[in-house]
Design a protein with these regions (language model features):
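Amphipathic alpha-helical packing elements
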Residues: 140-181
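Long amphipathic alpha-helical segments with strong coiled-coil/leucine-zipper propensity
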Residues: 58-147
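N-terminal interaction modules that seed assembly of large macromolecular complexes
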Residues: 43-63
Length: 258
């Protein structure tokens, strides 16, 4: 269990926290955390009545985060956390989406209609939804659905004591770089995230905007709120992602087999 608390001097001029906080803001907010606080909660303080999921009243934050990592992700150690983040930054649910999109886009008009005719109730709306999202996002797919969750993983990992603050930020760097290189604003990135979430959850979005969903409304609320609007600074997309001096996701991964 790491005991190093947030030290700005420990990460030099890195701006990775400025990427991490908005990337993880929705789940931080939904789980009664503070979107401005890296790790969701202040270590040592009980998680106050979130009423959702594994986050329970009077549960020490590190226990809540460890249970979430274990129950939802099968992560029970530092090694598993680092391996999962490094892997999913490159190959997450977007791989499954692209595979499905490739299948449906490769069909003739008659083949597509035959697929719909043979599909069950859910697939009858998921195939058109997959096709529409593929046309909308192209090669980007549902990338932000994967990248944003990496922010939550490293923050939970920090809070759980599996990573130090500098290590958590360094582990997120590849995801932040991919985000910056692929999108140009938080609205665009969050629309992609929301599309990805609804695709993964197999929600029927026929005739509905992602901004009308509970998560879409949550993002708009965070962005419009005076308390949290500054998190979503589009100027970040015009700046370089500044790494943590002397640390990287690659070095953390390599150290596991050293």
């Amino acid at each position: 269990y790491t005991t190093l608390f947030r030290s700005k001097t420990a990460v030099g001029d890195s701006n990775l926290e400025a990427w991490a906080l908005p990337m993880g803001a929705i789940l931080s907010s939904l789980n009664a955390g503070d979107p401005y606080w890296f790790g969701l909660y202040s270590r040592g303080l009980p998680v106050a009545g979130s009423g959702s999921g594994a986050y329970t009243t009077n549960d020490p934050p590190y226990k809540s985060c460890r249970r979430t990592l274990s129950d939802d992700w099968g992560i029970d150690s530092r090694e598993a956390l680092i391996t999962t983040v490094c892997s999913m930054t490159l190959h997450g649910h977007n791989d499954s989406f692209q595979e499905a999109a490739g299948l449906v886009n490769g069909l003739s008009a008659s083949g597509y209609q035959e697929l719909l005719n043979e599909s069950g109730e859910v697939d009858r709306y998921m195939w058109p939804q997959t096709k529409a999202l593929s046309e909308k996002w192209g090669d980007r797919g549902i990338l932000c659905w994967d990248l944003f969750r990496m922010s939550n993983l490293v923050q939970w990992g920090y809070e759980a004591g599996y990573l130090t603050y500098p290590e958590a930020l360094a582990l997120l760097e590849p995801a932040a770089v991919r985000l910056k290189e692929t999108f140009s604003s938080w609205d665009e990135a969050y629309e992609n995230y929301l599309d990805g979430y609804n695709w993964w959850a197999r929600n029927d979005m026929t005739g509905q905007s992602v901004w009308e969903t509970s998560r879409g409304k949550r993002y708009l609320l965070l962005k419009e709120s005076e308390a949290t609007s500054a998190l979503f600074d589009d100027a970040l997309f015009s700046c370089a992602v500044l790494p943590v001096p002397g640390l990287s996701a690659a070095s953390l991964s390599a150290a596991l087999s050293a």
